[in-house]
């Protein structure tokens, strides 16, 4: 209780006692299956459109005959969104033997020409490479042009001059071939640094370069071999020497015109034009940078002079990496191999990229361990990248439960609380479908859509009906429904039609009906969008075998001859319990039960007395009144639609002593008008119509 000690006006907030219950979503869907790419560990990813699905999981694929029947998920996801589904979680199943494409990038310096190798009339000794980093007088280079499969190498030539203003490098002798920039890689003998920061050389420009880092596709699959990774040198900080500090060269303290974008641990290039040194920054104080390493000699740096070629430039050495796959592109700039916050390449790439991951191979010791593209800028991920060596088994789809965030397959959907609809498109084995049913029954608030097995080749007459009945007879649950036959879609991968499991499209219809009409409306007599036909035509007489209780097989029907398209023509669960035969009744109870569970959490640990019982009863009654007014419950008035009871008659003293609050709720769900019967008889004055 508050204390009132001094005369004043006290404004206090009070609890009104009314705790409204908000209805939960029933259209969030979870799919499990093989995809072209995407994460197979961690939490299933949410996608809200097919475009977003392709960004994470890729598009349609054909991994060859070994994986026939395991490529349904991308088509199902497309069908889900075509039928106006909006929230889809995907758990990727990884085939055995799948691996990620990768490459060990090399350091040193390899670059490209940005202008054809002849910069004068006729052949000359001038070239313009894409970068001058590490290139100085004495550096040896070799130009290699690969055009139309023909490889042309220049002689190994030494650099005799470097023009920083134009980027032109002078070689010791003229080139004997016109090296075209778009086809030419420039190999150098740049290797690393000595203890004083001077550039060391390889035995030759084509000698083996030091390993730099490993670049891998973000996840398994041959898609990674199509990744395009490019690396470019860049400098975040660029400065010109202004003066030494009191002539104290030995202290390695140098004043620059500007120290913008200089930072501790940056590798800087000390560029005198024809010679270069590289040092790390120990400190940046105003315009003064302090460098690591032995004392610098007087000739290593020079203040700004009249002659441009004598100016000493200080440039930080970073790199930019781009990764491109299909229409996706990522770019990371200002990267360093040193663990500099906000710049360290491992953190910057691995924490943000959906295309690649990088691994450091050794502690950085010099800036020429920056990755250098095999063709100057481009790095090919040429190792691994397998979609798998065998088709996934039932256990791969069912998955393993290693705890939160470590589950796989169907088990991974446990980590996503809001899922209400579950499907494993195209997988019809009894083990997998039993696992789906157990999953939904154990989690209570989920419903499984089961696919029919593929049609046999040249079956005897009636075999389809026998097959689907035999499949349905394996199950008895109020938490699943099965649909027959499979649908036919346009396969954009092959420009032909193909039969497809219907669960993805039907899950989209569930979501569409939930959003537009409500979960109490049966997801039947609804158009299936995005299809061109059905694998088998089922007529009314055949449906009279499949539909009645306890068979309860939902049929997809072709009504195009009646100008009504292709429709779902069934709304039953695969159960022998007549009370739960309708899908919408089961899912309405899921909606109401979960909404009450979530909406009454506030009552836990409240004093368990009449006041609490009244408040909880009021909250539930107000919620059920809204449900009734939406048309989900029978009755012309609320008392006929539901009752809520929470008092001494629902709890014993033992219940109270053990902390139990027990409420009894009864509802009268609306059931679908599955059989519309019009009875007509003769009447002297006209006709009489009775609708039941």
What are these language model-derived features?
Residues 180-189, 299-328:
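Surface-exposed interaction regions enriched in Ser/Thr/Asp/Glu
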Residues 114-115, 154-160, 203, 224-232, ...:
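Short amphipathic beta-strand/extended segments with alternating polar/hydrophobic composition
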Residues 97-180, 191-215, 222-301:
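Autoprocessing Asn-cyclization modules and mimics
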Residues 1-107, 133-137, 142-152, 163-164, ...:
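Structured, hydrophobic secondary-structure cores that serve as assembly/anchoring elements
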Residues 361-406:
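Long, low-complexity, polar/charged, intrinsically disordered or flexibly structured peripheral segments
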Residues 237-240, 342-346, 685-692:
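Short, cationic low-complexity segments
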Residues 192-213, 388-417:
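Short linear interaction motifs
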Residues 321, 333-334, 346-352, 455, ...:
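A short, surface-exposed interaction/processing loop segment used at functional sites
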């Amino acid at each position: 209780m508050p204390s009132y000690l001094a005369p004043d006006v006290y404004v206090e907030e009070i609890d009104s006692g009314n705790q409204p219950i908000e209805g939960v979503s029933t259209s969030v869907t979870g799919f499990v299956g093989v995809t072209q790419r995407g994460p197979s560990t961690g939490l299933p990813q949410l996608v809200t459109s097919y475009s977003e699905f392709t960004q994470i999981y890729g598009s349609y694929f054909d991994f060859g005959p070994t994986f026939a029947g395991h490529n349904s998920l991308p088509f199902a996801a497309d069908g889900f969104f075509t039928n106006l589904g909006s929230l889809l979680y995907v758990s990727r199943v990884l085939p055995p033997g799948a691996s990620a494409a990768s490459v060990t990038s090399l350091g040193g310096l390899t670059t490209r020409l940005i202008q054809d190798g002849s910069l004068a009339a006729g052949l000359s000794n001038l070239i313009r490479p894409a970068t001058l980093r590490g290139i100085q007088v004495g550096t040896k280079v070799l130009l290699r042009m690969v055009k139309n499969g023909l490889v042309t190498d220049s002689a190994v030539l030494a650099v005799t001059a470097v023009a920083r203003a134009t980027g032109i490098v002078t070689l010791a002798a003229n080139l004997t071939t016109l090296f075209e920039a778009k086809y030419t890689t420039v190999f150098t003998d740049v290797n690393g640094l000595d203890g004083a920061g001077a550039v060391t050389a390889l035995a030759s420009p084509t000698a083996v370069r030091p390993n730099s880092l490993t670049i891998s596709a973000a996840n398994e699959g041959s898609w990674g071999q199509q990744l395009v990774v490019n690396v470019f040198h860049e400098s975040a900080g660029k400065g010109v020497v202004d003066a030494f500090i009191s002539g104290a060269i030995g202290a390695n303290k140098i004043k620059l015109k500007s120290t913008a974008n200089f930072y501790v641990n940056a590798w800087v290039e000390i560029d005198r034009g024809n010679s270069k040194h590289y040092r790390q920054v120990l400190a940046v104080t105003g315009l003064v940078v302090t460098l690591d390493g032995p004392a610098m000699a007087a000739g290593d740096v020079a203040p700004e002079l009249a002659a441009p070629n004598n100016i000493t430039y200080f440039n930080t050495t970073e790199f930019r990496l781009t990764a491109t796959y299909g229409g996706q592109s990522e770019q990371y700039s200002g990267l360093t191999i040193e663990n500099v916050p906000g710049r360290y390449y491992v953190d910057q790439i691995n924490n943000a990229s959906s295309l690649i991951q990088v691994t450091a191979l050794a502690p950085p010791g010099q800036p020429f361990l920056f990755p250098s593209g095999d063709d100057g800028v481009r790095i090919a991920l040429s190792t691994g990248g397998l979609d798998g060596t065998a088709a996934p088994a039932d256990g791969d789809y069912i998955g393993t439960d290693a705890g939160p965030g470590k589950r796989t397959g169907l088990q991974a959907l446990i980590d996503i609380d809001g899922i209400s609809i579950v499907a494993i498109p195209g997988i019809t084995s009894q083990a997998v479908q039993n696992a789906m049913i157990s999953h939904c029954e154990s989690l209570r608030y989920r419903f499984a859509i089961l696919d029919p097995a593929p049609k046999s080749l040249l079956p005897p007459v009636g075999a389809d009906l026998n097959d689907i009945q035999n499949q349905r007879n394996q199950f008895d649950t109020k938490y699943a429904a099965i649909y027959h036959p499979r649908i036919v879609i346009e396969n954009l991968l092959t420009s032909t039609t193909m039969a497809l499991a219907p669960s993805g499209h039907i899950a989209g219809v569930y979501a569409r009906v939930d959003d537009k009409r409500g979960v109490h409306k049966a997801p039947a007599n609804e158009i299936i969008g995005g299809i061109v036909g059905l694998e088998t035509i089922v007529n009314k007489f055949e449906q009279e075998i499949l539909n009645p209780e306890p068979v309860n097989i939902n049929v997809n029907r072709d009504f195009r001859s009646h100008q009504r398209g292709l429709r779902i023509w069934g709304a039953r669960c695969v159960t022998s319990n007549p009370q739960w035969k309708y899908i919408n009744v089961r899912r309405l109870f899921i909606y109401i039960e979960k909404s009450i569970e979530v909406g009454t959490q506030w009552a836990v640990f409240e004093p368990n007395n009449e006041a609490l019982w009244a408040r909880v009863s009021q909250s539930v009654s107000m919620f059920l009144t809204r449900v009734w007014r939406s048309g989900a419950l029978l009755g012309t008035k609320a008392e006929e639609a539901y009752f809520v009871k929470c008092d001494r008659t629902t709890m014993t003293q033992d219940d109270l002593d053990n902390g139990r609050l027990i409420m009894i709720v009864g509802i009268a769900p609306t059931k679908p008008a599955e059989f519309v019967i019009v009875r007509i008889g003769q009447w002297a004055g006209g006709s009489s119509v009775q609708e039941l």
